[in-house]
Amino acid sequence: MSRTKIAIAGALGRMGNNLINSALSNNNVELVGVFDVNDIDPSFINKNQIQENVFTTREESFEKADIVIDFTTPKALFNFTEAAVSNNTGLVIGTTGLDESHFNLLKQTSNSTKVFYAPNMSYG
């Protein structure tokens, strides 16, 4: 069985770091992308023991991943849904603070690709 290729949006945040650590210790997933609003510094890759072939841009991450896990901001969702549909990439949304326009967008996106919305996944 092949491993699920995942990318993490919001990699520089607390939940992003937790997801990276979980992905690196899970034999069922392959971490193919990490990206954030700000560029990912190479020292972040080394510090987190991420392989050098992991992509650090949104575009490459959506192209290579089966699923992108999003822990960024509601504003970013508009760009992510477009990239998910054009690359047939599934979306797991953990971002909080979405409004009706975001939910309508997610519903529309779910007609073209996989969407899972689960806010408030943080510890304690």
Walk through the language-model features, giving the residues of each:
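Extreme N-terminal starter segment of soluble prokaryotic enzymes
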Residues: 2-6
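N-terminal Rossmann NAD(P)H-binding glycine-rich loop of SDR-like oxidoreductase domains
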Residues: 9-12, 16-21
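NAD(P)-binding Rossmann-fold cofactor-contacting core
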Residues: 25-47
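Short acidic low-complexity segments
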Residues: 31, 50-65
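N-terminal Rossmann-like NAD(P) cofactor-binding module of classical short-chain dehydrogenase/reductase
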Residues: 68-69
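Short glycine-/small-residue-rich Rossmann-like dinucleotide-binding loops
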Residues: 72-73, 96
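Rossmann-fold NAD(P)-binding glycine/threonine-rich loop
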Residues: 82, 86, 95-117
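A short hydrophobic/small-residue beta-strand
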Residues: 90-92
